[in-house]
Amino acid sequence: MPFTLHDLDENVTPTLERYCAIPALSPHFDPDWTTSGHLESALQLLAGWVRSRLPEADVREERLEGRTPLLWVEVPAHGEANSDTVVLYGHFDKQPPLGEWSEGLAPFTPVRRGNRLYARGAVDDGYATFAAVSALEEVRRSGGTHPRCVLLIEGSEESGSPDLEAYLDALAERIGRIDLMICLDSGALSYDRLWVTSSLRGLVNVDITVRVLERAQHSGTASGVVPSSFRIIRQLLDRVEDATSGEVLLPEAHCAVPDWVESATRGVAEEFGDVVAQEMPVVEGLELMGRDGADRLVRRTWKPALSVIGLAGAPEPRQAGNVLRTSTTVTLSLRLPPLADARAAGEALVRVLSVDPPSGAEVEVTLTSAASGWAARELPEDLRRILDEASRGSFGGPLALTGEGGTIPFLFQLGQRFPETPFIATGVLGPESNAHGIDEMLNLEAAVNLINALAHLLSHYGGSQ
């Protein structure tokens, strides 16, 4: 008897909803996180639940000076003895609410509607700890065996994982050799099969501030004489992006697209249609970038893209007076293809934006984060077979692989340390999950299916193959 939605509701959902109610914002969004205590509350809740479910596990709340905490769970091998170690990764920090949620929904008030759970952090990535533990319980309940498993659940992923390297160093001896790495923070193009991520984009964030005046001036007096700080921002952005096509102009932000990516995206588009266009809640009449569904998949996963994600220095429209403002600040997000060097791209971005300021304006550019992307090595044939069995048995459909447009710094960091280790990045951030946006949603049926798929993988991997 596999893990069911009833099992989830009995053993997981109540605690998951308590987690969802905690505003455990990542430190980038809550600089006073040590004072607010929300990350600590989330950590304690998860640790307590894991101890109640796996009493034989070594559960520790790891702490390093000046770092967000990390949840360590070590579960010894069960059944047939083998020396393999599987590391399962997730995170408990959250994105901010972003804005007003739909009627009846709120970021930190979990709402169940049918088999959907709405709350910030439900799918990204609160479910991960519960899924990993439930899968291990399911293996044991069904009489199976599993290798030694280590759960690493961090608290700074949504800030670019600045604390993770320090923990990997501190825990390296305790972790030991890693034979399989599973990340539960990735996405899916549909809920009818197990999706394994073949690549992730990198990310560079910078803040640009342009100052033109010591104090604001009446626009009737200063306009036409003093250049607008916003216009200078526009000029600077034109150095980085073609304003008409959206193409990124920095050579360091590009890499060659492998032939297999082109063929794989064509295959996905032929089977699922224009999935990228289908999932975007665009306004009527908007023309999307890209020639077709396959091209849009490539653009989302293997091409750079620039977005303005923050703006300061301007009042709300209702408060706007006829004033030439002193300055404008924007935060840029530059997504990078999987094989681009984030550090090199970040340095190039800062350099291009800083040199020869238009009109002699005061320009300050700050690189706030840089995380390289990741491309998976080809899965070993036996592992791919196990995953396909898990997908068909749990979801109903065959295993599928796709690239993702987001960034998980952990995969690049572990990939550098363990280049020969197979990596599986998967998750239930599927259609309408709205991670990072309003109305974030966890599809509970998909979570159940993933738990069963994960249980199959753990019980058939390693010494029990």
Give the residues covered by each predicted segment.
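A short core secondary-structure module
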Residues: 166, 223-244
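Histidine/acidic-residue-rich, glycine-tolerant segments that coordinate divalent metal ions
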Residues: 146-228
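An extended, acidic, His-containing surface patch that forms the Zn2+-binding/catalytic region
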Residues: 43, 81, 190-191, 248-327, ...
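A generic structural motif
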Residues: 123, 214-216, 334-342, 371
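A common structural junction motif
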Residues: 93, 240-245, 350-360
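Active-site metal-coordination/substrate-binding segment of hydrolases
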Residues: 82-153, 449
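N-terminal helical capping/dimerization or prosegment-like subdomains
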Residues: 1-100, 327, 346
